[in-house]
Curated annotation (Swiss-Prot):
Biological source species: Heliobacterium modesticaldum (strain ATCC 51547 / Ice1)
Molecular function in Gene Ontology: hydrolase activity
NCBIfam families xref list: PRK00685.1 (NF001911)
Keywords: Hydrolase
Pfam families given in the database record: Lactamase_B_2
Membership in a protein family: Belongs to the UPF0173 family.
InterPro entries: Metallo-B-lactamas (IPR001279), RibonucZ/Hydroxyglut_hydro (IPR036866), UPF0173 (IPR022877), UPF0173_UPF0282_UlaG_hydrolase (IPR050114)
Lineage: superkingdom: Bacteria
Name this polypeptide is given: UPF0173 metal-dependent hydrolase Helmi_16730
Length: 238
Protein backbone atom coordinates (compact mmCIF):
# COMPACT_ATOMS: atom_id res chain seq x y z
CA UNK A 1 0.00 0.00 0.00
CA UNK A 2 1.18 3.50 -0.80
CA UNK A 3 -0.32 6.85 0.16
CA UNK A 4 0.28 9.71 -2.29
CA UNK A 5 -0.45 13.22 -0.99
CA UNK A 6 -0.56 16.26 -3.26
CA UNK A 7 0.53 19.65 -1.95
CA UNK A 8 -0.05 21.62 -5.15
CA UNK A 9 2.16 22.30 -8.18
CA UNK A 10 4.53 19.30 -8.50
CA UNK A 11 4.86 18.72 -4.75
CA UNK A 12 3.98 15.21 -3.52
CA UNK A 13 4.58 12.99 -0.51
CA UNK A 14 4.85 9.21 -0.90
CA UNK A 15 4.28 7.28 2.32
CA UNK A 16 4.27 3.48 2.64
CA UNK A 17 3.77 3.56 6.39
CA UNK A 18 7.48 3.20 7.12
CA UNK A 19 9.23 5.77 4.95
CA UNK A 20 8.22 9.22 3.73
CA UNK A 21 9.52 10.46 0.39
CA UNK A 22 8.90 14.06 -0.69
CA UNK A 23 9.09 15.06 -4.34
CA UNK A 24 9.75 18.65 -5.48
CA UNK A 25 8.85 20.19 -2.09
CA UNK A 26 7.64 23.65 -3.09
CA UNK A 27 5.90 24.94 0.06
CA UNK A 28 7.16 28.47 0.71
CA UNK A 29 5.76 30.80 -1.94
CA UNK A 30 3.33 28.18 -3.25
CA UNK A 31 -0.03 29.99 -3.25
CA UNK A 32 -2.11 26.80 -3.34
CA UNK A 33 -0.22 24.77 -0.73
CA UNK A 34 -2.31 24.25 2.43
CA UNK A 35 0.60 23.74 4.86
CA UNK A 36 4.01 25.18 5.63
CA UNK A 37 7.33 23.45 5.10
CA UNK A 38 7.99 22.99 8.80
CA UNK A 39 4.81 20.91 9.12
CA UNK A 40 6.14 18.03 7.02
CA UNK A 41 8.58 15.27 7.83
CA UNK A 42 10.59 13.27 5.34
CA UNK A 43 13.20 10.55 5.16
CA UNK A 44 14.14 11.24 1.52
CA UNK A 45 13.53 14.15 -0.84
CA UNK A 46 13.55 13.77 -4.63
CA UNK A 47 14.28 16.96 -6.58
CA UNK A 48 13.73 16.95 -10.34
CA UNK A 49 15.67 20.14 -11.13
CA UNK A 50 17.00 23.36 -9.69
CA UNK A 51 14.20 25.81 -10.42
CA UNK A 52 12.83 27.43 -7.29
CA UNK A 53 9.34 25.96 -7.65
CA UNK A 54 10.81 22.44 -7.53
CA UNK A 55 13.94 22.61 -5.40
CA UNK A 56 11.72 24.69 -3.15
CA UNK A 57 12.25 24.01 0.54
CA UNK A 58 14.29 20.84 0.01
CA UNK A 59 17.43 22.07 1.75
CA UNK A 60 15.63 23.54 4.76
CA UNK A 61 13.52 20.41 5.18
CA UNK A 62 16.60 18.19 4.87
CA UNK A 63 18.36 20.25 7.54
CA UNK A 64 15.39 20.01 9.86
CA UNK A 65 14.62 16.32 9.40
CA UNK A 66 17.94 14.76 8.41
CA UNK A 67 16.42 13.61 5.12
CA UNK A 68 18.64 12.62 2.21
CA UNK A 69 18.11 14.50 -1.06
CA UNK A 70 18.16 12.40 -4.24
CA UNK A 71 18.72 14.27 -7.49
CA UNK A 72 21.08 14.68 -10.43
CA UNK A 73 24.75 14.49 -9.49
CA UNK A 74 25.25 18.22 -10.01
CA UNK A 75 22.20 19.30 -8.02
CA UNK A 76 22.97 16.79 -5.27
CA UNK A 77 26.49 18.21 -5.05
CA UNK A 78 25.04 21.71 -4.73
CA UNK A 79 22.82 20.52 -1.88
CA UNK A 80 25.77 18.86 -0.14
CA UNK A 81 27.62 22.17 -0.23
CA UNK A 82 24.64 23.65 1.59
CA UNK A 83 25.21 21.21 4.43
CA UNK A 84 22.73 18.39 3.83
CA UNK A 85 22.96 14.72 2.92
CA UNK A 86 22.47 14.07 -0.77
CA UNK A 87 22.81 11.20 -3.21
CA UNK A 88 23.64 12.07 -6.82
CA UNK A 89 22.50 10.06 -9.83
CA UNK A 90 22.33 10.42 -13.60
CA UNK A 91 19.53 9.88 -16.10
CA UNK A 92 19.17 6.17 -16.86
CA UNK A 93 20.69 5.21 -13.54
CA UNK A 94 18.81 3.35 -10.84
CA UNK A 95 19.55 2.57 -7.22
CA UNK A 96 17.93 0.61 -4.43
CA UNK A 97 17.27 2.48 -1.20
CA UNK A 98 15.78 1.13 2.04
CA UNK A 99 12.29 2.12 0.87
CA UNK A 100 12.55 0.80 -2.70
CA UNK A 101 14.08 1.67 -6.05
CA UNK A 102 14.56 5.02 -7.77
CA UNK A 103 15.39 5.45 -11.45
CA UNK A 104 16.12 8.83 -13.00
CA UNK A 105 14.24 9.36 -16.26
CA UNK A 106 14.76 11.86 -19.05
CA UNK A 107 13.07 15.26 -18.91
CA UNK A 108 13.18 18.06 -21.48
CA UNK A 109 13.46 21.30 -19.54
CA UNK A 110 16.07 23.50 -17.83
CA UNK A 111 17.75 23.25 -14.45
CA UNK A 112 19.39 26.40 -13.20
CA UNK A 113 19.52 28.19 -9.86
CA UNK A 114 19.54 31.98 -9.62
CA UNK A 115 21.44 33.28 -6.59
CA UNK A 116 21.58 37.06 -6.63
CA UNK A 117 23.21 38.05 -9.90
CA UNK A 118 24.59 34.55 -10.47
CA UNK A 119 23.11 31.74 -12.52
CA UNK A 120 24.25 28.26 -11.48
CA UNK A 121 23.98 25.35 -13.89
CA UNK A 122 23.11 22.30 -11.81
CA UNK A 123 22.99 19.59 -14.46
CA UNK A 124 20.13 18.07 -16.39
CA UNK A 125 16.52 18.01 -15.28
CA UNK A 126 14.99 14.61 -14.67
CA UNK A 127 11.89 12.68 -13.74
CA UNK A 128 11.65 9.77 -11.33
CA UNK A 129 10.36 6.22 -11.55
CA UNK A 130 9.85 5.11 -7.96
CA UNK A 131 9.08 1.56 -6.87
CA UNK A 132 7.83 1.74 -3.30
CA UNK A 133 5.24 -0.05 -1.20
CA UNK A 134 4.76 -2.59 -3.97
CA UNK A 135 3.71 0.14 -6.41
CA UNK A 136 5.31 1.98 -9.32
CA UNK A 137 5.01 5.77 -9.54
CA UNK A 138 6.36 7.97 -12.35
CA UNK A 139 6.84 11.66 -11.51
CA UNK A 140 7.64 13.34 -14.82
CA UNK A 141 9.12 16.51 -13.32
CA UNK A 142 8.87 19.51 -15.62
CA UNK A 143 9.10 18.15 -19.14
CA UNK A 144 7.87 18.41 -22.66
CA UNK A 145 6.45 15.36 -24.37
CA UNK A 146 9.15 12.83 -25.21
CA UNK A 147 9.11 9.32 -26.65
CA UNK A 148 11.39 8.27 -23.81
CA UNK A 149 8.16 7.86 -21.87
CA UNK A 150 7.45 4.72 -23.90
CA UNK A 151 10.41 3.07 -22.17
CA UNK A 152 8.75 3.19 -18.75
CA UNK A 153 6.55 0.14 -19.31
CA UNK A 154 8.51 -1.39 -22.19
CA UNK A 155 11.89 -1.64 -20.51
CA UNK A 156 11.97 -0.31 -16.98
CA UNK A 157 8.90 -2.22 -15.76
CA UNK A 158 9.62 -5.16 -18.08
CA UNK A 159 6.14 -5.14 -19.56
CA UNK A 160 4.35 -4.59 -16.26
CA UNK A 161 1.81 -1.80 -16.05
CA UNK A 162 2.70 1.47 -14.38
CA UNK A 163 0.49 2.09 -11.36
CA UNK A 164 0.53 5.89 -11.26
CA UNK A 165 1.75 8.71 -13.50
CA UNK A 166 2.11 12.24 -12.14
CA UNK A 167 2.07 14.45 -15.25
CA UNK A 168 2.30 18.22 -15.77
CA UNK A 169 -0.57 19.76 -17.75
CA UNK A 170 0.01 23.50 -17.26
CA UNK A 171 1.61 24.21 -20.66
CA UNK A 172 4.03 27.14 -21.23
CA UNK A 173 6.82 25.56 -19.11
CA UNK A 174 6.14 21.95 -20.10
CA UNK A 175 3.39 19.70 -21.36
CA UNK A 176 -0.08 21.10 -21.83
CA UNK A 177 -3.26 19.01 -21.72
CA UNK A 178 -2.96 17.73 -25.30
CA UNK A 179 0.60 16.52 -24.85
CA UNK A 180 -0.21 15.09 -21.42
CA UNK A 181 -2.95 13.04 -23.10
CA UNK A 182 -0.38 11.64 -25.56
CA UNK A 183 1.92 10.90 -22.63
CA UNK A 184 -0.89 9.03 -20.90
CA UNK A 185 -1.42 6.91 -24.01
CA UNK A 186 2.31 6.09 -24.17
CA UNK A 187 2.66 5.36 -20.47
CA UNK A 188 -0.63 3.42 -20.17
CA UNK A 189 -0.77 3.83 -16.38
CA UNK A 190 -3.53 2.43 -14.21
CA UNK A 191 -3.98 5.92 -12.78
CA UNK A 192 -2.91 9.45 -13.58
CA UNK A 193 -2.81 12.56 -11.40
CA UNK A 194 -2.37 15.89 -13.25
CA UNK A 195 0.06 18.37 -11.70
CA UNK A 196 1.87 21.65 -12.35
CA UNK A 197 -1.26 23.63 -13.21
CA UNK A 198 -3.34 26.48 -11.70
CA UNK A 199 -0.55 27.50 -9.31
CA UNK A 200 -0.02 30.74 -11.25
CA UNK A 201 -2.04 32.45 -14.03
CA UNK A 202 0.43 31.44 -16.75
CA UNK A 203 -0.31 27.74 -16.17
CA UNK A 204 -4.07 27.90 -15.62
CA UNK A 205 -5.94 24.95 -17.13
CA UNK A 206 -9.40 23.38 -17.11
CA UNK A 207 -8.51 20.22 -15.23
CA UNK A 208 -12.08 18.89 -15.36
CA UNK A 209 -11.95 19.00 -19.17
CA UNK A 210 -8.60 17.18 -19.10
CA UNK A 211 -10.07 14.46 -16.89
CA UNK A 212 -13.02 14.01 -19.28
CA UNK A 213 -10.72 13.54 -22.27
CA UNK A 214 -8.48 11.07 -20.43
CA UNK A 215 -11.55 9.09 -19.36
CA UNK A 216 -13.01 9.09 -22.88
CA UNK A 217 -9.84 8.25 -24.81
CA UNK A 218 -7.82 6.00 -22.48
CA UNK A 219 -8.43 3.28 -19.92
CA UNK A 220 -6.43 5.11 -17.25
CA UNK A 221 -8.24 6.48 -14.21
CA UNK A 222 -7.68 10.22 -13.86
CA UNK A 223 -7.73 11.45 -10.27
CA UNK A 224 -7.83 15.21 -9.76
CA UNK A 225 -6.43 15.95 -6.32
CA UNK A 226 -6.94 19.22 -4.50
CA UNK A 227 -3.89 20.39 -2.54
CA UNK A 228 -3.86 18.37 0.67
CA UNK A 229 -5.73 15.38 -0.81
CA UNK A 230 -4.33 11.85 -0.57
CA UNK A 231 -4.69 9.01 -3.08
CA UNK A 232 -4.14 5.51 -1.69
CA UNK A 233 -2.77 2.81 -3.98
CA UNK A 234 -3.67 -0.66 -2.80
CA UNK A 235 -4.90 -3.99 -4.10
CA UNK A 236 -3.21 -5.75 -6.98
CA UNK A 237 -0.67 -4.23 -9.33
CA UNK A 238 3.03 -3.85 -9.64
Amino acid sequence: MLHVTFFGHANFLLDDGQTKVLIDPFFTGNPVCPIKADAVSADYILVSHGHGDHLGDAIDIAKGTGATIISSFELASYCQRKGVKAHGMAIGGKRDFPFGRVRLTAAVHGSGIIEGDNYLDVGNPCGFLVNMGGKSVYHAGDTGLTRDMELINMCFLKGGRLDLALLPIGDNFGMGPEDALYATKMLHPRMIVPMHYNTFPVIEQDVAAFKRVVTELTDSECHVLAPGDTLTLNGHGR
